[in-house]
Amino acid sequence: MARRCEICDKGVVAGVQFSHSHRQSKRTWAPNIKKIKALVNGTPKTVRVCTRCLRSGKVQRAI
């Protein structure tokens, strides 16, 4: 499953994590993706959406 929001196109970000002794280790930060049923052009469809888009009202859930 792709870790990418279908609304805002938010995806995984790679970077470096620092410990207290300043040792570095590579890691990734993934968005909080939920699989929901949303109305797309009036029909319910399963989409992968981040929680930021859900909370801001960019997606209308299908009931």
Curated annotation (Swiss-Prot):
- InterPro entries (alphabetical): Bacterial_rp_bL28, Ribosomal_bL28, Ribosomal_bL28/bL31-like_sf, Ribosomal_bL28_bact-type, Ribosomal_bL28_sf
Q: Which UniProt keywords apply?
A: Ribonucleoprotein, Ribosomal protein
Record's keyword annotation contains rRNA-binding: no
Which GO cellular component term is one of those annotated?
Answer: ribosome
Does the UniProt entry include the keyword Ribonucleoprotein?
yes
Q: Name one Pfam family in it.
A: Ribosomal_L28
| Biological process according to GO | translation
Q: Name one GO molecular function term.
A: structural constituent of ribosome
Its family remark reads: Belongs to the bacterial ribosomal protein bL28 family.
Name under which the protein is recorded: Large ribosomal subunit protein bL28
Q: Which organism is it from?
A: Clostridium botulinum (strain Eklund 17B / Type B)
